[in-house]
UniProtKB/Swiss-Prot annotation:
Organism: Vibrio parahaemolyticus serotype O3:K6 (strain RIMD 2210633)
Binding-site residues for Mg(2+), renumbered to this chain: 373, 403
Matching InterPro entries: PLipase_D/transphosphatidylase, PP_kinase, PP_kinase_C_1, PP_kinase_middle, PP_kinase_middle_dom_sf, PPK_C_dom2, PPK_N_dom, PPK_N_dom_sf
Binding site for ATP: 45, 466, 562, 590
Active site residues of this protein: 433
Main function: Catalyzes the reversible transfer of the terminal phosphate of ATP to form a long-chain polyphosphate (polyP).
NCBIfam families per UniProt: poly_P_kin, PRK05443.1-1
Name of the molecule in the record: Polyphosphate kinase
Cofactor: Mg(2+)
Catalytic reactions on record: [phosphate](n) + ATP = [phosphate](n+1) + ADP
Pfam families named in the record: PP_kinase, PP_kinase_C, PP_kinase_C_1, PP_kinase_N
Amino acid sequence: MSAEKLYIEKELSWLSFNERVLQEAADKTVPLIERIRFLGIFSNNLDEFYKVRFADVKRRILINQERGGSDNSKRLLSKMQAKALKLNEQFDELYSELIREMARRRIFLVNEHQLDEAQEKWITKYFRKEVMPHITPLLMKDEIDVLQFLKDEYAYIAVELRKEDHSQYALIEIPTDHLPRFVMVPEQKGKRRKTIILLDNIIRYCLDELFKGFFDYDELAGYAMKMTRDAEYDLRNEIEYSLLEQMSAGVNQRLTAMPVRFVYEREMPQEMLDFLCSKLRISNYDNLIPGGRYHNFKDFIAFPNVGREYLENKPMPPMKCADFEGYANSFEAIKAKDILLYYPYHTFDHIGELVRQASFDPKVLSIKINIYRVAKDSRLMNSLIDAVHNGKNVTVVVELQARFDEEANIEWSKVLTEAGVHVIFGAPGLKIHSKLLMISRREGDDIIRYAHIGTGNFHEKTARIYTDFSLLTADQEITNEVRNVFGYIENPYRPVKFNHLMVSPRNSRTQIYRLIDNEIANAKAGKKAGLTIKVNNLVDKGIVTRLYAASNAGVKINMIIRGMCALVPGIEGVSENIRIISIVDRFLEHPRVVITHNDGDPQVYISSADWMTRNIDHRIEVAAPVRDPRLKQRIIDITNIHFTDTVKARLIDKEMSNSYVPRGNRKKVRSQVAIYDYLKNIEKQTRRQKSDVSDT
C-alpha cells in the first residue's frame, strides 16, 4: 500500500480537528453563548494555522522551486486552501444562524444600520468620549509603506473617501487593546431585550465624525480587513549576542514578515482590493480570502455574559484535593503518598500554594522550575521572587521560543533576573517543553526532594480550561532523575542515564518503541496485549509504523487524539486493531498518557510530549511512570470513561469525516461531566476515610 494511503497529511488532519471545533458551534445541545464562543475558538485556531502551517508549506514550495524538487507541497497547499475555504463558508452560515437564534432570545447583535434614534445618540456620544481618542487614521499615500505599519492579526477598517470619480484610501485600526470589542447599548427601562454592538460598527457609524473638516468627499465607506503574517523567524546565532537579544530580534522580525493571508470584506470594491494588494505586495491570490464584515473573530471567545445563566455552561467549580488535608503543610502530604491532580476538575491553586509555602519555609533550600507558558500576572512566578528575597536558591529555566509567548517569556526573564533569580535558557537547539518543578528541603540530616511532573503548563488561567495531569511525588528514584533532568538542561553534553523517566531527546524514542515491542511480543506469545494512548498529536512516522506492526501482531490499540493524527485506522491487514476517537467539549483535552497492558500488570505514564518527531527527537520532554496503584487505576478509569462517551466523541477515520461515535442503545455519557462526577466521588470517599480514622 502506498505511503500516501498509510499516512494522513498533518496539515489536513489539523483542519479536520478545527472542523470538530466548528461542530461544537453547530451543536444545538450546546448553550447558545458557548456556541458563539466556539466560533471564536475556531477563528483563533485558523489564524494560527495560517501563521504557522500554511506559511510553512508556502516556504517549502519556494525551496522546492529553487532546488527543482517535486510539487507535492503545491498539491497539499491546494487541498489546504480548498478545505479552509469550505470551513469558512460553514462558519459564515453558522454565524448567521446564531445571530438569528440570539434574536429569538431577545439578544440583538446590531450593526450601524439597525440603530434607533436613541441608540444613535448614545453611540455618537460613546464614540466621541471613548473611541475617538484612540483612533488615528493612516492615509495610504504613494510614499507610505503600508505593509510596515499594518499589525499582524489586528482588525482594520479600510476607508474609501470618494469625491466625484477620485478616491482616497485610509486605514483605521480597531482599538481593541484599549476598548472592549463588544459594547452593551443601554435599553429603555422595562425592556428585557439586550442590544450589543461591535466596536467595528460604532466606528463605521461615526466615520464622518473622524474625517469631516479635514477632507473633501462626497461619499464615505468602510470595509473590514485583516492581514496574517508568517510567524516564523530566524535567530542570528551570532556569538556576540545573548539568546535573549537574539530572541528579541527574532520576535521583531514578525512585525515586518510577509503576509500569508489577507482577509477582506466581500463587498469591498475591486479597485480598492487591487490597491490594497499592491500596497501589501500580495501577488499570489492564494493568499486572498473573502469574508464577512467582521474579522478577528477570536474576540468572540470572550463574548459577554448577558445575564442569562441558561445560555452558558453550568458551572463545574474546580475541587480541592483531599489528599492535602490533615497535614501541617503540602510537603508532609506529598511525602505521605504521591498525589495526582487533574485540572480543571482540581484547582491549580494547590501548585501555587506549594510554591508559596516553599518560598518562606525555613527548611527549603532551593527551588527549580522550567517555564514554557505562564500567566501574565502569575502568582506562582511572584512566589519564586519572594523565595529569592527569603534567601532561597531559585533557578528558573525559561523557554524563550514558546510560540506566541516569546515576548511574555522575554519580559518574565528580565523581571526574574532583576529580582536575583538564576534564569537559564537551556540547551542550544533544544526547545524545553517539560513541566518540571523540584523543591529541595532539609529534613533532619537529610535533603528530601519533592517533584512535580506534569502534562501541562504552570499557567493559572489555562488550567481552568485545559485538562492536564500533575504528579507530585517524593519518591527518591523519581526525584533524583528529575534533578538529573535539570542538570541535563544546564549541561546537555554531559553523559546522563535515565532508568525511570522518559526524557527527550535522550531515550524517549527507544522507550516508546520498547513499550510497543513488549506488547507485540506478548501478543505473539498468545498473551493478552493492549495499548491505550492519549495525545494531542500523533504524526511521527516511526511511531505510526510501529503501531501498525503492533496492530498486525494482534495488539488491541485504543487511542484518543485531540488534534493531528497521521495514522489511518481500520485498514485491513494494517490497522484493523486500532480504534481512534477524539473528544471536543467545554474543556480542551491536553494530557499525554500511555497505558500498556503488560500481561495484566499495567504500566502507566504521563508525559509532556506529543508523538511528533520534534517532541521525541528535538525537544526536552519528560514522561514519568505513575507507580502508586491508586493513581494508576485512577488514570486508567479516567481514560476508560472517555471511551464510553456517546455525546462528544468523534471517530477518526481515513475520510476525516468526524462522525460521532454511534450511541446505539447505550446510555448518554458525556465523558468530561462523568469524569468530574467520578473525581468528586473520590474526594468524598477520601474525606470520609480521613474522618473515620480521626474518629477512632
